[in-house]
Amino acid sequence: LPAIPDTFRDHRSRNNQLLLAALAQIRPQVDRAIARYGRDRVAVVLGTSTSGLDEGDVHVNLTLNGKASEAWRYPQQELGDPSRFLSRWLALDGPAYTLSTACSSSARAIISGRRLIEAGLADVAIVGGADTLSRMPINGFHSLESLSTTQCQPFSRDRSGITIGEGAALMLLTREPQPIALLGIGESSDAWHISAPHPQGEGAMRAIQQALDDAGIMPEQVGYINLHGTATRLNDQIEARVINALFGERVPCSSTKHLTGHTLGAAGITEAAIGMLILQRNLLLPAQDFSQSPQDDTLPPCGLIEHPQPLSRPVILSNSFAFGGNNTSILLGRMS
């Protein structure tokens, strides 16, 4: 991963190194946006679930063993540090903040970035997120008995929980017409339970419907749904129910978390990026992996695909449903 120099040592974390790796992939577009609009008109909105928490864990362990590290700085573990770091790295003067809403964090960053542009507070927004492995989420999901001992198997009969991954992705939002557009956004709160979805999926359904309404799109116009699909018993059951109610079986769908793991706060942007690449490069839709365990036939049928297939309609829905009933849905589309 890219090294963080001493001039930015207060921001030295694996989380921010992943952000730099993601930034390198869009740096030419970012530089052009800065040159065109000015440093005060480029916003940074990121999502993370843990930020540099692992750096804090390492420091605590060293301190308890009488080996405190001089390299540790408190800002490394702050939730707001990713956006502050990226803004400093690019010498930007526009709005910069980090959202932390668990697994929907970076999807909410996309939504918030669009709203900044619509409100006239920025002309361009760098949106995305990053999350890295640390003890807190591993121990937390273990205490909830939600960690799988093998590769996660969303929507399968023997699914037993999530596999935690790490990753980062960034996108550049702009008013200017682009080949791929953010067509619609939706968000809601269940106000039901801190770690369980609403039993009827009421909030998730509202978020999806908002995104469809925002885009002016009917359910049958969607070509693929990237499901949140964490491989926990309850999440997959409720999401299948929601998709069945809104789309029936007519829209191909799958969860890609068996490929990436659950990247926590980076999941929303990671899966939106997968959707964008499918649209950009005409990639085949990723199939659901039932090689280890067959599909759970007790779930409401919802168009799960078992073999890769082409995208028939150039509109993709991506769902992110987080703890606390924090739901987001975004619609991406290929523009003619």
Describe each PLM feature range:
Residues 55-59, 136-140, 192-195, 236-238, ...:
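Short acidic, glycine/serine/threonine-rich loops at helix termini
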Residues 151-215, 224:
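Condensing-enzyme catalytic core mediating Claisen C-C bond formation in acyl metabolism
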Residues 44, 86, 106, 113, ...:
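Conserved small-residue
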